Amino acid sequence: MNLGKESEVLEFKESTSELHSAIESIASILNKHDYGEIYFGVYDNGEPKGQIVTDSTIKKISDSILRDIEPRIIPTITEISIEGKSIIKVSFSGKNKPYSAFGKFLVRVGTQNRHMTREELKKLFLDSDYSYP
């Protein structure tokens, strides 16, 4: 079962070895949208690869999200099975823009994360109702 294509609110990671990049994607997605999902154990083309899932794996993801994204968000992290392969699904939402990851302010453009311009960041800080175009 293919999970589809990556988008502005959906990202696939082959494993939790890409956790740093996933954290950046979460902040980036939230700076443009109010919600998103990251899947660990899925190829970029949406095909399931599988991921070893333990309590410490889930804790590592949760701890990084709580520690490295400001302001803090509380994600939903679940293990799902697709074609007999374990996948980690991280669902998140937040409306307290702007969000930073590792002290960097990023925004999602298509399937890529890019640094916000000074003007974009200024608008987000000054106008809490600002919605990225």
Label each PLM-derived region with a short phrase.
Residues 1-133:
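Conserved N-terminal catalytic/coupling substructures associated with nucleotide/phosphate chemistry
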